Amino acid sequence: MTYPQKIDSTGCSPKYTIDCIEVFGIRKILGDAQKVVEVPDRNFLPGKGFFMALSNHAYDFEDLHPIDIVEDIATHQEWQFDRIADDQISMEMAGQWRSYSITLAWCAGDQTLSLICSFEMDPPAHRIPALYEALNAVNDMSWAGGFTYWGAERLMAYRYGLILSNGQMAMPDQIDTMISAAVTSAERYYPAFQMVTWGEKDLEMALKVAIAEAYSHA
């Protein structure tokens, strides 16, 4: 299994958080994109409490590194992961719709823990404008984090940054929630993205499906 190479996070310039492919080393981890246009019955959507936080783990918070916590969570959940560098880790996780590549990186200079959850998406060229319209609508509905589409790499990515200050530490429950929220959002809105692209459905219908899914699993 090939994982992203080590990156240099020194300085944490805007490029560190914006140039997603080069900096976080997000990989294509799937084959041909699934062309799902309908939403099958399913009983699973990860949500609050789906990922077990390591609240009872004995941590030395004085010397705690947030990526160490992520590694503990990945080990506890038996996810495939690679500790690319002291400040970066990459994981793979299987969802109901897709498999996801999740990368977390710590920028000490900005005191920010950044997360990117990506999955492959290769919509028809003539439906790209509809996809961007859907992205705008979905991001308006999202309280934390947001989606962006990297056309050249054919990847959809959910991005979120946990900003800390004054030497605050990222707690296990916070990191656990970051990962859970990323996968939950990807699972929730994947059908809507597929409906407006391969299904060529209108945006309103696609969003109703996503909202209905969210309420059915609340």
Predicted regions span which residues?
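Short, Lys/Arg-enriched N-terminal segments with co-localized hydrophobic residues
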Residues: 28, 33-51
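Terminal, regulation- and interaction-focused segments at domain boundaries
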Residues: 43, 48-72, 118-121
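Ser/Thr-rich, low-complexity intrinsically disordered terminal regions
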Residues: 72, 76-120
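Short, internal acidic amphipathic alpha-helical interface segments
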Residues: 119-155
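Long, amphipathic alpha-helical coupling/dimerization segments that relay conformational signals between
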Residues: 157-193
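Short, highly charged C-terminal tails/helix-capping segments
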Residues: 194-218
